[in-house]
Amino acid sequence: MVSKSDQLLIVVSILEGRHFPKRPKHMLIVEAKFDGEQLATDPVDHTDQPEFATELAWEIDRKALHQHRLQRTPIKLQCFALDPSTSARETIGYIVLDLRTAQETKQAPKWYQLLSNKYTKFKSEIQISIALETDTKAPVDSFKAKGAPPRDGKVPASLSGLDPKDIVAVLNEEGGYHQIGPAGYCTDFFIMSVTIAFATQLEQLIPCTMKLPERQPEFFFYYSLLGNDVTNEPFSDLINPNFEPERASVRIRSSIEILRVYLTLHSKLQIHLCCGDQSLGSTEIPLTGLLKKGSTEINHRPVTVEGAFTLDPPNRAKQKLAPIPVELAPTVGVSVALQREGMDVQSLIELKTQNEHEPHHSKKRVLTPIKENTHTGPQSPSESPVPPHNQSPPTKDDATESEVESLLYDKDTKLNPKAISSSVPALLAKPVTTSIASEAASGQKIAVPATSHHFCFSIDLRSIHDLEVGFPINCILRYSYPFFGSAAPIMTNPPVEVRKNMEVFLPQSYCAFDFATLPHQLQDTFLRIPLLVELWHKDKMSKDLLLGIARIQLSNILSSEKTRFLGSNGEQCWRQTFSESVPIVATQGSNNRIVDLSYTVTLEDYGLVKMREIFVSDSSQGLSAVQQKPSSVPPAPCPSEIQTEPRETLEYKAALELEMWKEMQEDIFENQLKQKELAHMQALAEEWKKRDRERESLVKKKVAEYNILEGKLQKTLIDLEKREQQLAIAESELQRERRELKSERERNLQELQDSIRRAKEDCVHQVELERLKMKQLEEDKHRLQQQLNDAENKYKTLEKEFHQFKDQQSSKPEIRLQSEINLLTLEKVELERKLESATKSKLHYKQQWGRALKELARLKQREQESQMARLKKQQEELEQMRLRYLAAEEKDTVKTERQELLDIRNELNRLRQQEQKQYPDSREIASGKMDGPHGSALEEGLDDYLTRLIEERDTLMRTGVYNHEDRIISELDRQIREVLAKNNASN
């Protein structure tokens, strides 16, 4: 057991995430996998910052943690997007955590970026911390039934202060019972027993890919009864489970009400089928039916819950396996009984087995008080020590179809390595009556004649080498030689693998035979009958295959050199040894050599056999114990005695007795052979039926598994066909797009080349035109330069003439006066033209200004309406802002208009000054005519100015932007009043 301080928890805290896209119809799940165990968080919303807030923990001890750190075992976290409507999962990315970073001290969480992120535009991260914590909870066996969620149990009114969760079973070692509930209130004694009676179809729990921990595994049922671990007697055959029903009982001190509450809280009993420390399947027995509410059945008879319960493999939910058909479902027959102490116990469940129908006697196991009671099977009888070089008999587990004969011959027996036989009996020294009386007293006897020799023949198949076939073989060697006294085949074990260019030594290949025979018969047999050694290829997946046979000529040893040695009794003995290699020739096809066999044979002659009797038993083994009895040899008749008849001589009687004995032994041997044949045929038939049942159940299991695999394969094939169609469509689309892109590229390239060619041609043509233009311009330049020179010369000539003419005309006064008049007229015309132009520009400016003001007013009105519609709640503030804005704009407009008016006024003043400067001379010339028109012109100017001011004021008022309180309107009114006042004053 691991101490509590060495028990740790690897805690991975998955806190939150960031930089995830929003997918409202999906959920996020994080699965963590460590050491083959997988844990997952609860689904959370797929937002940009998902909140997981989950801790995942694995139990581990320090030794295993150290091993994992040395191996750098990772903790892999995978993030999935789950669609709740279809249960489809998409892999988003994964994170690999290093176990070596986990410490027992608290560490700050870190952000880990998802690898192979599906959201390539987002750098999704998850905040994770990993730490080691001491596992403080009590150690629980991995196969114990976990407590069901607490249910509402009602406590009696007298114990209303007792919490149902506090009701536990406490062992009282002195009293030998479990106390459930308060000791003062709960005083009734009960007996609770669990019986596992039978099991069927257990082979369905082991898939084809599962490896069992042992070559010959033992299976057993395990459950926990009030904290006591209980296992039944192990069994090794899953197909035909044969075990005695066992009942485990516990003594309980409680009351019916408290016990009912306790059974409500612990409502299920888990029973596991185990192999070693691995659970192959489990089932749950409901216990709530034992004590039903308001039932008093327990006061009269035991209450039971019994039946055949289906075993489920532990990983069915994880692997999403298909359900097993009902007729193939593995079941276990269980009976749970509860009774008051002292009540007679009857059989609670009918014991059903497949192979036998007679009732079994259940074993009873009392669990209280707790003692270390180890239930073991019956011990096998001790065997005599096996001598070295013993040929071990073939066992049942190693048997295949090719070994049926060996199995049947050696069934329930052990092969004596040194078989004793009497092949050739000599003359009998006893009369017939003595032999018959001896047989009646102690069974059948064989008298070995004194002329026979005691031989020991040993065979050692050392090795095989020089393999000629092109594939490795997994071989055993097998032979039999009935002359040595045993017809059972001798085989090497275990199988060895032989490859090319290698020599393999055979295990357990030595065997020795002790027998008695005549030397000339031994020589004759060795010359006539060779020893045939068969080479078999063993395959776990198929039937054994006979590859070839080697012929060993045993007569070769007779010609080898004899060596002398002393026997166990100090007698002189002889030994002959012979070694060689023989080829093993193929049995099928051409007789080609397969491999060479190296062997050594030894023949030891221990001399003459003394007169002995061999008792032959009727057992199926055919081997007998040897009892040696010294026989009194009758004295030889004296020669002086009278000669008797030939039929009365001892030799004749001995020969007659020998013939009769031979006939009797032949009959006995034939009867024994028939009995053995019948027994062997019966055993073979039983074995065949058993194996047929096993094969049938295995075939059913395989068919069910293959049907499931076929369904998966069909689904996979359909998916593959769809995928292939999609790939074909996508590939054709890709080819089409590739062709289009290629054609478009070629077209663009052609267009580009054409445009480049045209641009080059245009450039060349443009350069030529520019050159021609330059040439033309040069010619024009020379021509114009020539014209300019001519014009300058002409101008100089005309200027000289003009000066001369001017000098001539300047001397005349009327000419000078006329020239001045012309100059003044020209200036007047020019000033009138400028005045008209200024007036037109002023009118145009006024029109543009009016349109701009109207447009500005319209835009302001639209802006005000939109602002009023959008921002009604902020009307006052926006009104102030609008007023400020209008005031500022009005101020700017007033400034601009004032500046423009000032510019106009300055222009008018400048024009008036110019007019006043231009006309003083004309006034002096016609002073009398100028006085009257001057007053009228001034009045007309004031009227025009007044009209213009009124038009400007009315234009501004019509725009709707200004009112009478505005400064510009007030200024115009003031100027109008001043003009009116001046006009009145002049009148």
UniProtKB/Swiss-Prot annotation:
GO terms for cellular component: centriole; centrosome; cytoplasm. Residues 1-112, 438-567 form the C2 domain. SUPFAM superfamilies: C2 domain (Calcium/lipid-binding domain, CaLB). Keywords: Coiled coil, Cytoplasm, Cytoskeleton, Phosphoprotein, Repeat. GO terms for biological process: astral microtubule organization; centrosome cycle; cerebral cortex development; interkinetic nuclear migration; neurogenesis; positive regulation of centriole elongation; positive regulation of centrosome duplication; positive regulation of cilium assembly. Its main location: cytoplasm. Residues 352-408, 912-937 are annotated as: Disordered. Residues 670-919 form a coiled coil. It is found in: Cytoplasm, Cytoskeleton, Microtubule organizing center, Centrosome. Transmembrane segments: none annotated. The modification Phosphoserine is found at S936. Belongs to the CEP120 family. Interacts with TACC2 and TACC3. Interacts with CCDC52. Plays a role in the microtubule-dependent coupling of the nucleus and the centrosome. Involved in the processes that regulate centrosome-mediated interkinetic nuclear migration (INM) of neural progenitors and for proper positioning of neurons during brain development. Also implicated in the migration and selfrenewal of neural progenitors. May play a role in centriole duplication during mitosis. Required for the recruitment of CEP295 to the proximal end of new-born centrioles at the centriolar microtubule wall during early S phase in a PLK4-dependent manner. This is Centrosomal protein of 120 kDa. It comes from Bos taurus (Bovine). The lineage of its organism: Eukaryota, Metazoa, Chordata, Craniata, Vertebrata.
